[in-house]
């Protein structure tokens, strides 16, 4: 059943508690358990729910997988009226509406994908108070006609999701979001909230200012996602590196692979498909129907890998994405957090895997500097890129470095990133840097990395012989290091902005003022060793993922039943039950309706709707 299709008749009763059901906190806990099947709130969910449930305003900054949606869904259910949710993407609206309906909540999404008859019916139900939550796009909520509909309705709360779209410096900027501050004047008595999963200090201030939330209470939670393993390595043969990663660590798993260009998206998806991986492309240049179909396959089926540009992701609410891979650099730490945060939203072990190289740095800098953006914006974007490069090149705990960018402190190394698991060290790399920069200077600053490395290693190539570069004093001074090591040196020099690259002239290297400071001994250089990796990769331990005492055969049968039920209901499998619920089901082996209803993620509606089928399977084992 489509999220936009009919579900509730006008006479169907709401699952929300009555106003005499106790305090806001008590009613919220009741809804949390009876509707969503959770026993307790995560911090700071309960504080936020109480704040808005009692009529206050709030700005919520939670990482992906932090339970952000519950922060506006529960206040909407404990207050009288209909909750209005402003969301930027149709897919995101439909996913959340499907999940809410599965839990017995009267929800609807009104968007351009509906026929006029269905839109009018939902508007009528909104005015008549027959909806608990309604999702709309910013363009619709700003239209005078729809605002008249809202004025004739009783609103419980107004939630502006993905609020970072208000930032003109952000990669998801939506001009319509800037105008949403007008809702404060139109509905002064309705509590408002803004929610986002990623925003640095300047973006947070911009959200508060543009949306008129100066009096709002701010709620934040750590950006730490300890279930996601962070890994960033040197790019060598990216497709082969990716395929090895998928085969060794994620066979049959759902995941997202990000590429910078549309052409690389299609090439990578086609190549993976030929190698036996079920891979689908996604980018803005594909026909709308192809994008919709590929996204639906990814959401509703298991073991699908989507290869995409950043056009894919913000509307994805799939909790069982086991990995996010980058074969190209994101634009900033915020983009990296936003994109990798789509992995492991169910709290189970997942991977954020990335490879990058010298050309990635040069390409990103060239794109920023060559854009038509104002100089101020270019400076901001270059600063953000340099912060990301610092994260990529750190020799200390990667998670500590990531969290420090957002002003957080992790007291101890995380133990779940590549730099913790395969320790690297920093060393005084001034001499190596001087050799590399000298090779660039003495060859006239007109060649690329490969030629400079050949000079350093003393390789007699045709180009070196033709240009008589074998006569240079720098020729052969780097024979003590291999080609991978010199590639790492040049990459790190570029990352530290100690070497210029002209992409318009085929990646020629040139020296900057900072380069000359290094050559003259006025600026020391710290480099890091490349991690020494075991030839035999350690494969993911299935027992860690499954948990103790779980029968893999039973879990497979539970997943098969879930898929059957999902097809019957016309929803993605995770909307029926998430992986975490199935794992607990396989481990606890409930035999009675009461035991089943006490499982994580099993609310009253799902216990009634799905309990008999799952209990029949469990009792047969």
Name every feature range the model reports, one short phrase each.
Residues 17-35, 39-43, 47-69, 77-79, ...:
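Helicase motor core with emphasis on the C-terminal RecA-like subdomain
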Residues 1-28, 380-382, 411-621:
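Accessory DNA-binding and partner-docking regions appended to nucleic-acid-acting proteins
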Residues 47, 241, 387, 435-438, ...:
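Pre-recognition alpha-helix immediately N-terminal to the DNA-recognition helix
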Residues 375-408:
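Short, charged low-complexity linear segments at domain edges
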């Amino acid at each position: 059943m489509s999220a936009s299709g009919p579900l509730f008749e006008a006479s169907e009763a709401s699952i929300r508690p009555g106003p005499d059901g106790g305090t806001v906190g008590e009613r919220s806990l009741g809804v949390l358990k009876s509707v969503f099947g959770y026993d307790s709130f995560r911090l700071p969910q309960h504080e936020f729910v109480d704040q808005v449930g009692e009529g206050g305003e709030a700005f919520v900054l939670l990482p992906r997988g932090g339970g952000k949606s519950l922060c506006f869904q529960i206040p909407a259910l404990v207050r009288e009226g209909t909750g209005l949710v402003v969301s930027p993407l149709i897919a995101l609206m439909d996913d959340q509406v499907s999940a809410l309906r599965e839990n017995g909540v009267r929800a609807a999404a009104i968007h351009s994908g509906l026929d006029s008859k269905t839109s009018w019916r939902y508007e009528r139900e909104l005015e008549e108070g027959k909806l608990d939550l309604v999702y709309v796009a910013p363009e619709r909520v700003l239209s005078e006609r729809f605002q008249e509909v809202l004025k004739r309705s009783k609103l419980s709360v107004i939630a502006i999701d993905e609020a970072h779209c208000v930032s003109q410096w952000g990669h998801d900027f939506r001009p319509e979001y800037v105008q949403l501050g007008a809702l404060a004047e139109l509905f002064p008595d309705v509590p408002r909230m803004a929610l986002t999963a990623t925003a640095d200090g300047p973006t947070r201030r911009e959200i508060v200012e543009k949306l008129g939330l100066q009096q709002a209470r701010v709620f934040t939670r750590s950006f730490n996602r300890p279930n996601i393993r962070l890994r960033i390595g040197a790019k060598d043969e990216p497709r082969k590196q990716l395929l090895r990663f998928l085969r060794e660590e994620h066979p049959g798993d759902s995941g997202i692979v990000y590429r910078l260009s549309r052409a690389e998206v299609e090439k990578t998806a086609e190549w993976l498909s030929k190698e036996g991986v079920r891979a689908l492309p996604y980018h803005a240049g594909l026909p709308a129907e192809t994008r919709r179909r590929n996204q639906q396959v990814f959401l509703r089926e298991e073991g699908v890998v989507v290869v995409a540009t950043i056009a894919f992701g913000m509307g994805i609410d799939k909790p069982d994405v086991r990995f996010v891979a980058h074969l190209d650099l994101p634009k900033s730490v915020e983009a990296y957090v936003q994109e990798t945060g789509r992995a492991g939203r169910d709290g189970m072990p997942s991977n954020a895997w990335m490879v990058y190289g010298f050309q990635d740095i040069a390409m990103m800098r060239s794109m920023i500097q060559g854009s038509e953006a104002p100089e101020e914006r270019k400076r901001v974007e270059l600063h953000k890129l340099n912060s990301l490069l610092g994260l990529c090149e750190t020799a200390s705990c990667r998670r500590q470095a990531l969290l420090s960018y957002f002003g957080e402190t992790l007291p101890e190394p995380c133990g779940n990133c590549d730099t913790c698991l395969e320790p690297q060290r920093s060393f005084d790399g001034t001499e190596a840097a001087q050799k590399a920069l000298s090779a660039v200077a003495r060859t006239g600053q007109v060649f690329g990395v490969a030629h400079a490395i050949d000079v350093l290693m003393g390789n007699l190539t045709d180009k070196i012989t033709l240009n008589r570069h074998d006569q240079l004093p720098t020729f052969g001074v780097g024979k003590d290091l291999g080609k991978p090591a010199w590639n790492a040196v040049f990459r790190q020099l570029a990352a530290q902005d100690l070497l210029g690259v002209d992409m318009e002239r085929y990646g020629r290297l040139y020296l900057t003022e900072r380069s000359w400071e290094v050559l003259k001994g006025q600026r020391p250089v710290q480099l890091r060793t490349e991690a020494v990796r075991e030839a035999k990769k350690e494969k993911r331990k299935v027992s860690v993922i499954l948990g103790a005492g779980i029968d893999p055969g039973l879990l497979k049968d539970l997943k098969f039943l879930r898929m059957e039920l999902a097809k019957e209901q016309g929803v993605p499998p995770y909307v029926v039950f998430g992986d975490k619920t199935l794992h607990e089901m396989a481990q606890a082996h409930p035999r009675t309706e009461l035991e089943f209803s006490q499982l994580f993620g099993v609310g009253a509606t799902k216990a009634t709707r799905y309990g008999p089928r799952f209990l029949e399977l469990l009792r047969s084992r």
